[in-house]
Amino acid sequence: MSRSAEVICVGTELLLGEVLNSNAQFLGQELARLGIAHFHQTVVGDNPTRIKRAIALACQRSQLLIFTGGLGPTPDDLTTETLADFFQAPLVNHPEILEDIARKFAQRNRVPSPSNDKQALLPDGAQILPNPIGSAPGIIWHPRPELTIFTFPGVPKEFHRMWQETAVPYLQSTGWVTAQIYSRVLRFWGIPESTLADQVAPLLALTNPTVAPYASKGQARLRISTRATSQETAHQVIAPIEQQIRQICGLHCFGGDDETLESVVGKLLQQRGETLAVAESCTGGGLGQRITGVSGSSTYFLGGVISYTNAAKRDLLKVNAADLEQYGAVSAIVAEQMAAGVRSQLHSTWGISITGIAGPDGGSETKPVGLVYIGLSGPQGTQSFEYQISPLRGRDWIRQMSTSHALDRLRRQLLADES
Protein backbone atom coordinates (compact mmCIF):
# COMPACT_ATOMS: atom_id res chain seq x y z
CA MET A 1 0.00 0.00 0.00
CA SER A 2 1.29 3.46 -0.87
CA ARG A 3 1.94 5.75 2.07
CA SER A 4 1.48 9.49 2.36
CA ALA A 5 2.18 12.33 4.76
CA GLU A 6 -0.21 14.97 6.04
CA VAL A 7 0.61 18.35 7.57
CA ILE A 8 -1.45 19.80 10.42
CA CYS A 9 -0.53 23.33 11.52
CA VAL A 10 -2.02 24.32 14.87
CA GLY A 11 -2.59 27.92 15.89
CA THR A 12 -5.47 30.38 15.91
CA GLU A 13 -3.01 33.09 14.87
CA LEU A 14 -2.57 31.23 11.56
CA LEU A 15 -6.31 31.14 10.91
CA LEU A 16 -6.62 34.86 11.61
CA GLY A 17 -3.75 35.70 9.30
CA GLU A 18 -1.77 37.30 12.09
CA VAL A 19 1.21 35.03 11.37
CA LEU A 20 2.29 33.81 7.93
CA ASN A 21 2.18 30.01 7.77
CA SER A 22 5.69 29.57 6.39
CA ASN A 23 5.95 26.15 8.06
CA ALA A 24 3.41 24.69 5.62
CA GLN A 25 5.40 26.00 2.67
CA PHE A 26 8.63 24.62 4.12
CA LEU A 27 7.11 21.18 4.70
CA GLY A 28 5.62 21.10 1.22
CA GLN A 29 9.04 21.75 -0.26
CA GLU A 30 10.80 19.28 2.01
CA LEU A 31 8.35 16.43 1.47
CA ALA A 32 8.59 16.96 -2.28
CA ARG A 33 12.37 16.98 -2.07
CA LEU A 34 12.36 13.72 -0.12
CA GLY A 35 9.93 12.10 -2.54
CA ILE A 36 7.25 11.55 0.12
CA ALA A 37 3.67 11.68 -1.15
CA HIS A 38 1.76 14.56 0.41
CA PHE A 39 -1.84 15.33 -0.50
CA HIS A 40 -3.35 17.25 2.41
CA GLN A 41 -2.58 20.22 4.67
CA THR A 42 -4.80 21.45 7.48
CA VAL A 43 -4.73 24.59 9.60
CA VAL A 44 -6.68 24.33 12.83
CA GLY A 45 -7.13 26.74 15.72
CA ASP A 46 -6.21 26.19 19.36
CA ASN A 47 -9.32 24.19 20.15
CA PRO A 48 -9.08 20.57 21.35
CA THR A 49 -12.35 19.46 19.74
CA ARG A 50 -11.36 20.76 16.32
CA ILE A 51 -7.82 19.43 16.68
CA LYS A 52 -9.28 15.96 17.38
CA ARG A 53 -11.45 16.20 14.27
CA ALA A 54 -8.37 17.04 12.22
CA ILE A 55 -6.53 14.06 13.72
CA ALA A 56 -9.42 11.68 13.02
CA LEU A 57 -9.67 12.76 9.39
CA ALA A 58 -5.91 12.60 8.86
CA CYS A 59 -5.73 9.07 10.29
CA GLN A 60 -8.22 7.88 7.67
CA ARG A 61 -6.03 8.89 4.73
CA SER A 62 -2.40 9.33 5.83
CA GLN A 63 0.25 7.29 7.61
CA LEU A 64 2.63 10.12 8.57
CA LEU A 65 1.17 13.08 10.46
CA ILE A 66 3.35 16.14 10.95
CA PHE A 67 2.16 18.72 13.48
CA THR A 68 3.60 22.20 13.92
CA GLY A 69 2.63 24.57 16.71
CA GLY A 70 0.88 24.23 20.03
CA LEU A 71 3.86 22.94 22.05
CA GLY A 72 4.49 26.00 24.18
CA PRO A 73 3.91 26.55 27.91
CA THR A 74 0.69 28.58 27.73
CA PRO A 75 -2.86 27.25 28.30
CA ASP A 76 -3.73 27.54 24.60
CA ASP A 77 -0.80 25.30 23.58
CA LEU A 78 -2.80 22.08 23.29
CA THR A 79 -1.22 19.83 20.67
CA THR A 80 0.54 17.34 22.95
CA GLU A 81 -2.27 16.79 25.44
CA THR A 82 -4.90 16.63 22.68
CA LEU A 83 -2.94 13.94 20.84
CA ALA A 84 -2.56 11.96 24.07
CA ASP A 85 -6.27 12.27 24.81
CA PHE A 86 -7.29 11.27 21.28
CA PHE A 87 -5.22 8.08 21.37
CA GLN A 88 -6.03 7.48 25.06
CA ALA A 89 -2.38 7.51 26.10
CA PRO A 90 -1.24 8.74 29.51
CA LEU A 91 1.14 11.68 29.74
CA VAL A 92 4.55 10.83 31.20
CA ASN A 93 6.80 13.36 32.91
CA HIS A 94 10.38 13.67 31.58
CA PRO A 95 12.65 15.40 34.13
CA GLU A 96 15.44 15.65 31.56
CA ILE A 97 13.30 18.05 29.54
CA LEU A 98 12.89 20.35 32.54
CA GLU A 99 16.64 20.20 33.15
CA ASP A 100 17.26 21.22 29.55
CA ILE A 101 14.77 24.09 29.82
CA ALA A 102 16.38 25.30 33.06
CA ARG A 103 19.82 25.22 31.46
CA LYS A 104 18.67 27.30 28.51
CA PHE A 105 16.94 29.81 30.75
CA ALA A 106 20.07 30.11 32.92
CA GLN A 107 22.09 31.06 29.85
CA ARG A 108 19.80 34.10 29.56
CA ASN A 109 19.88 34.85 33.30
CA ARG A 110 16.29 33.69 33.67
CA VAL A 111 14.47 30.92 35.50
CA PRO A 112 11.61 28.80 34.12
CA SER A 113 8.09 29.46 35.31
CA PRO A 114 5.71 26.75 36.57
CA SER A 115 3.95 26.90 33.20
CA ASN A 116 7.02 25.33 31.57
CA ASP A 117 6.36 22.11 33.51
CA LYS A 118 3.73 21.02 30.97
CA GLN A 119 6.39 20.90 28.24
CA ALA A 120 7.95 17.89 30.00
CA LEU A 121 4.71 15.89 29.72
CA LEU A 122 4.71 13.65 26.64
CA PRO A 123 2.50 10.75 25.56
CA ASP A 124 3.58 7.36 26.87
CA GLY A 125 5.87 5.67 24.34
CA ALA A 126 6.78 8.86 22.49
CA GLN A 127 10.41 9.52 21.60
CA ILE A 128 11.73 12.98 22.45
CA LEU A 129 12.76 15.23 19.55
CA PRO A 130 15.29 17.58 21.16
CA ASN A 131 14.95 21.30 20.52
CA PRO A 132 18.50 22.72 20.43
CA ILE A 133 17.28 26.32 20.44
CA GLY A 134 13.97 26.72 22.29
CA SER A 135 12.14 25.21 25.23
CA ALA A 136 9.56 23.09 23.40
CA PRO A 137 10.69 19.56 22.43
CA GLY A 138 8.83 17.61 19.80
CA ILE A 139 8.05 13.92 19.57
CA ILE A 140 8.21 10.92 17.27
CA TRP A 141 5.35 8.64 18.23
CA HIS A 142 3.69 5.48 16.95
CA PRO A 143 0.29 5.39 18.68
CA ARG A 144 -0.74 2.73 16.16
CA PRO A 145 1.49 0.27 14.28
CA GLU A 146 0.78 1.83 10.90
CA LEU A 147 0.94 5.46 12.06
CA THR A 148 3.87 7.81 12.69
CA ILE A 149 3.39 11.22 14.32
CA PHE A 150 5.87 14.08 14.47
CA THR A 151 5.30 17.22 16.51
CA PHE A 152 7.36 20.39 16.19
CA PRO A 153 7.22 23.87 17.70
CA GLY A 154 5.69 26.54 15.51
CA VAL A 155 8.71 28.86 15.63
CA PRO A 156 10.21 28.41 12.14
CA LYS A 157 13.85 28.73 13.21
CA GLU A 158 13.41 26.00 15.83
CA PHE A 159 11.27 23.80 13.60
CA HIS A 160 13.61 23.92 10.58
CA ARG A 161 16.63 22.89 12.59
CA MET A 162 14.79 20.06 14.35
CA TRP A 163 13.44 18.84 11.02
CA GLN A 164 16.86 18.67 9.39
CA GLU A 165 18.70 17.22 12.38
CA THR A 166 16.17 14.62 13.54
CA ALA A 167 13.18 14.11 11.25
CA VAL A 168 15.01 13.77 7.93
CA PRO A 169 17.51 11.17 9.22
CA TYR A 170 14.63 9.24 10.83
CA LEU A 171 12.60 9.22 7.60
CA GLN A 172 15.65 8.13 5.61
CA SER A 173 16.39 5.28 8.00
CA THR A 174 12.83 3.95 8.20
CA GLY A 175 12.05 3.51 4.51
CA TRP A 176 10.06 6.68 3.92
CA VAL A 177 12.77 8.02 1.62
CA THR A 178 13.80 5.71 -1.22
CA ALA A 179 14.71 8.19 -3.96
CA GLN A 180 14.72 11.93 -3.48
CA ILE A 181 13.60 14.62 -5.88
CA TYR A 182 16.56 16.79 -6.82
CA SER A 183 15.97 20.16 -8.42
CA ARG A 184 17.98 22.91 -10.00
CA VAL A 185 16.33 26.34 -10.23
CA LEU A 186 17.50 28.71 -12.95
CA ARG A 187 16.79 32.42 -12.46
CA PHE A 188 16.12 34.95 -15.19
CA TRP A 189 15.81 38.72 -15.48
CA GLY A 190 14.48 40.87 -18.29
CA ILE A 191 12.23 38.21 -19.80
CA PRO A 192 8.55 37.54 -18.91
CA GLU A 193 7.58 34.08 -17.73
CA SER A 194 5.33 33.57 -20.77
CA THR A 195 8.12 34.47 -23.22
CA LEU A 196 10.53 32.21 -21.38
CA ALA A 197 8.04 29.34 -21.56
CA ASP A 198 7.64 29.86 -25.31
CA GLN A 199 11.40 29.79 -25.86
CA VAL A 200 11.90 26.52 -24.00
CA ALA A 201 8.55 24.95 -24.97
CA PRO A 202 9.99 21.61 -26.21
CA LEU A 203 11.78 21.12 -22.89
CA LEU A 204 8.55 21.62 -20.92
CA ALA A 205 7.28 18.34 -22.39
CA LEU A 206 10.12 16.31 -20.87
CA THR A 207 9.28 13.72 -18.22
CA ASN A 208 12.78 13.08 -16.85
CA PRO A 209 13.87 15.59 -15.92
CA THR A 210 10.78 17.77 -15.73
CA VAL A 211 11.07 21.48 -16.52
CA ALA A 212 8.54 23.87 -14.99
CA PRO A 213 8.34 27.68 -15.29
CA TYR A 214 7.15 30.00 -12.53
CA ALA A 215 7.62 33.60 -11.46
CA SER A 216 8.31 35.40 -8.20
CA LYS A 217 8.74 39.15 -7.59
CA GLY A 218 9.03 39.92 -11.27
CA GLN A 219 11.66 37.26 -11.80
CA ALA A 220 11.04 34.30 -14.11
CA ARG A 221 12.39 30.93 -13.03
CA LEU A 222 12.69 27.41 -14.38
CA ARG A 223 12.83 24.39 -12.10
CA ILE A 224 14.54 21.29 -13.50
CA SER A 225 13.70 18.22 -11.39
CA THR A 226 14.47 14.53 -11.39
CA ARG A 227 13.97 11.64 -9.00
CA ALA A 228 17.29 9.97 -8.18
CA THR A 229 19.12 7.99 -5.52
CA SER A 230 22.03 10.44 -5.30
CA GLN A 231 23.04 14.00 -6.08
CA GLU A 232 25.59 12.75 -8.59
CA THR A 233 23.02 10.73 -10.52
CA ALA A 234 20.63 13.69 -10.53
CA HIS A 235 23.35 16.01 -11.82
CA GLN A 236 23.96 13.73 -14.80
CA VAL A 237 20.31 14.09 -15.76
CA ILE A 238 19.86 17.80 -15.01
CA ALA A 239 23.14 19.30 -16.28
CA PRO A 240 22.57 18.72 -20.04
CA ILE A 241 19.12 20.34 -19.86
CA GLU A 242 20.50 23.30 -17.93
CA GLN A 243 23.14 23.77 -20.61
CA GLN A 244 20.47 23.78 -23.33
CA ILE A 245 18.40 26.36 -21.46
CA ARG A 246 21.38 28.65 -20.93
CA GLN A 247 22.21 28.45 -24.65
CA ILE A 248 18.62 29.29 -25.59
CA CYS A 249 18.15 32.15 -23.13
CA GLY A 250 21.60 33.72 -23.11
CA LEU A 251 22.17 36.64 -20.74
CA HIS A 252 18.59 36.52 -19.48
CA CYS A 253 19.70 33.63 -17.23
CA PHE A 254 21.70 35.23 -14.44
CA GLY A 255 22.08 32.40 -11.94
CA GLY A 256 20.78 29.31 -10.25
CA ASP A 257 19.32 28.09 -6.97
CA ASP A 258 19.97 30.68 -4.23
CA GLU A 259 21.94 33.13 -6.38
CA THR A 260 20.61 36.68 -6.59
CA LEU A 261 21.39 39.54 -8.93
CA GLU A 262 23.37 41.22 -6.16
CA SER A 263 25.38 38.10 -5.32
CA VAL A 264 26.18 37.46 -8.99
CA VAL A 265 27.30 41.08 -9.48
CA GLY A 266 29.41 40.85 -6.33
CA LYS A 267 31.11 37.70 -7.54
CA LEU A 268 31.94 39.29 -10.89
CA LEU A 269 33.38 42.39 -9.22
CA GLN A 270 35.49 40.26 -6.87
CA GLN A 271 36.83 38.19 -9.74
CA ARG A 272 37.88 41.36 -11.56
CA GLY A 273 39.23 43.16 -8.50
CA GLU A 274 36.90 46.11 -9.19
CA THR A 275 34.79 48.35 -6.97
CA LEU A 276 31.33 49.88 -7.00
CA ALA A 277 29.56 52.96 -5.66
CA VAL A 278 25.89 53.89 -5.98
CA ALA A 279 23.84 57.07 -6.17
CA GLU A 280 20.15 56.74 -5.38
CA SER A 281 17.15 59.00 -5.45
CA CYS A 282 13.74 57.29 -5.67
CA THR A 283 15.01 54.00 -4.20
CA GLY A 284 16.20 55.70 -1.01
CA GLY A 285 19.08 53.35 -0.27
CA GLY A 286 17.41 50.16 -1.45
CA LEU A 287 20.16 49.39 -3.93
CA GLY A 288 22.89 49.80 -1.34
CA GLN A 289 20.92 47.64 1.08
CA ARG A 290 20.72 44.80 -1.45
CA ILE A 291 24.42 45.03 -2.26
CA THR A 292 25.51 45.06 1.38
CA GLY A 293 23.19 42.14 2.13
CA VAL A 294 25.77 39.92 0.43
CA SER A 295 28.47 38.62 2.76
CA GLY A 296 31.88 39.96 1.78
CA SER A 297 30.51 42.97 -0.10
CA SER A 298 32.95 45.27 1.71
CA THR A 299 35.67 43.98 -0.62
CA TYR A 300 34.06 45.67 -3.63
CA PHE A 301 31.34 48.07 -2.43
CA LEU A 302 32.74 51.46 -1.41
CA GLY A 303 29.50 53.20 -0.45
CA GLY A 304 26.64 55.27 -1.75
CA VAL A 305 24.88 58.62 -1.78
CA ILE A 306 21.13 59.01 -1.25
CA SER A 307 20.56 62.26 -3.13
CA TYR A 308 16.84 62.74 -2.70
CA THR A 309 16.76 66.46 -3.47
CA ASN A 310 18.13 68.49 -6.35
CA ALA A 311 20.45 70.25 -3.92
CA ALA A 312 21.93 66.94 -2.80
CA LYS A 313 22.41 65.87 -6.40
CA ARG A 314 24.14 69.15 -7.14
CA ASP A 315 26.29 69.42 -4.02
CA LEU A 316 27.19 65.78 -3.36
CA LEU A 317 27.30 64.36 -6.88
CA LYS A 318 28.24 67.47 -8.86
CA VAL A 319 25.16 67.24 -11.10
CA ASN A 320 24.93 70.34 -13.29
CA ALA A 321 22.38 72.78 -11.89
CA ALA A 322 21.37 73.96 -15.35
CA ASP A 323 20.63 70.39 -16.44
CA LEU A 324 18.54 69.82 -13.34
CA GLU A 325 16.57 72.94 -14.18
CA GLN A 326 16.17 72.15 -17.89
CA TYR A 327 15.62 68.38 -17.86
CA GLY A 328 14.49 67.68 -14.32
CA ALA A 329 15.83 65.22 -11.77
CA VAL A 330 14.15 62.31 -13.56
CA SER A 331 16.04 62.35 -16.82
CA ALA A 332 18.72 60.45 -18.67
CA ILE A 333 21.30 63.22 -18.42
CA VAL A 334 20.88 63.55 -14.65
CA ALA A 335 21.09 59.76 -14.19
CA GLU A 336 24.36 59.76 -16.11
CA GLN A 337 25.79 62.64 -14.10
CA MET A 338 24.77 60.96 -10.84
CA ALA A 339 26.54 57.74 -11.82
CA ALA A 340 29.66 59.56 -12.99
CA GLY A 341 29.58 61.79 -9.93
CA VAL A 342 29.44 59.03 -7.36
CA ARG A 343 32.14 57.13 -9.22
CA SER A 344 34.36 60.21 -9.13
CA GLN A 345 33.60 61.14 -5.53
CA LEU A 346 34.21 57.64 -4.14
CA HIS A 347 36.97 56.68 -6.60
CA SER A 348 35.28 53.44 -7.64
CA THR A 349 35.62 51.42 -10.83
CA TRP A 350 31.88 51.55 -11.41
CA GLY A 351 29.08 53.92 -10.49
CA ILE A 352 25.37 53.13 -10.72
CA SER A 353 22.56 55.62 -10.26
CA ILE A 354 18.78 55.42 -10.00
CA THR A 355 16.40 58.34 -10.41
CA GLY A 356 12.69 58.03 -11.03
CA ILE A 357 9.12 58.56 -9.91
CA ALA A 358 8.04 55.86 -7.46
CA GLY A 359 4.62 57.40 -6.83
CA PRO A 360 1.85 57.33 -6.07
CA ASP A 361 2.18 61.11 -6.50
CA GLY A 362 4.59 63.17 -8.57
CA GLY A 363 3.85 61.84 -12.04
CA SER A 364 2.83 63.83 -15.08
CA GLU A 365 1.73 63.18 -18.64
CA THR A 366 5.30 63.35 -19.91
CA LYS A 367 6.87 61.72 -16.86
CA PRO A 368 4.38 59.20 -15.44
CA VAL A 369 4.68 57.28 -12.20
CA GLY A 370 7.02 54.34 -12.78
CA LEU A 371 9.41 56.20 -15.10
CA VAL A 372 12.95 55.34 -14.00
CA TYR A 373 16.40 56.09 -15.37
CA ILE A 374 19.43 53.97 -14.55
CA GLY A 375 22.87 55.51 -14.98
CA LEU A 376 25.98 53.36 -15.39
CA SER A 377 29.48 54.81 -15.38
CA GLY A 378 32.64 52.77 -15.87
CA PRO A 379 36.11 52.76 -17.38
CA GLN A 380 34.75 52.98 -20.93
CA GLY A 381 32.26 55.79 -20.36
CA THR A 382 28.81 56.59 -19.04
CA GLN A 383 25.39 55.60 -20.34
CA SER A 384 21.77 55.57 -19.22
CA PHE A 385 18.76 53.31 -19.59
CA GLU A 386 15.08 54.20 -19.44
CA TYR A 387 12.42 51.95 -17.89
CA GLN A 388 8.68 52.36 -17.54
CA ILE A 389 7.63 50.16 -14.61
CA SER A 390 3.94 49.45 -14.09
CA PRO A 391 2.55 51.58 -11.25
CA LEU A 392 -0.30 49.16 -10.58
CA ARG A 393 1.62 47.26 -7.89
CA GLY A 394 2.58 50.35 -5.96
CA ARG A 395 5.57 52.32 -4.77
CA ASP A 396 7.52 49.47 -3.17
CA TRP A 397 7.24 47.42 -6.35
CA ILE A 398 8.66 50.24 -8.48
CA ARG A 399 11.56 50.70 -6.08
CA GLN A 400 12.32 46.97 -5.97
CA MET A 401 12.17 46.62 -9.74
CA SER A 402 14.41 49.66 -10.15
CA THR A 403 17.17 48.16 -8.02
CA SER A 404 16.91 44.88 -9.95
CA HIS A 405 17.20 46.67 -13.29
CA ALA A 406 20.25 48.56 -12.02
CA LEU A 407 22.01 45.39 -10.87
CA ASP A 408 21.16 43.63 -14.11
CA ARG A 409 22.59 46.47 -16.19
CA LEU A 410 25.89 46.27 -14.33
CA ARG A 411 25.91 42.46 -14.61
CA ARG A 412 25.44 42.58 -18.36
CA GLN A 413 28.17 45.20 -18.74
CA LEU A 414 30.63 43.17 -16.68
CA LEU A 415 29.93 40.07 -18.77
CA ALA A 416 30.20 42.04 -22.01
CA ASP A 417 33.63 43.30 -20.97
CA GLU A 418 34.77 39.69 -20.48
CA SER A 419 33.64 38.51 -23.92
Swiss-Prot record:
Pfam families: CinA, CinA_KH, MoCF_biosynth. InterPro entries: CinA, CinA-like_C, CinA_C, CinA_KH, Competence-induced_CinA, MoaB/Mog-like_dom_sf, MoaB/Mog_dom. CDD domains: cinA. Gene3D superfamilies: 3.30.70.2860, CinA-like, MoaB/Mog-like domain. PANTHER family: NICOTINAMIDE-NUCLEOTIDE AMIDOHYDROLASE PNCC, NMN AMIDOHYDROLASE-LIKE PROTEIN YFAY. Belongs to the CinA family. This is CinA-like protein. It comes from Acaryochloris marina (strain MBIC 11017).
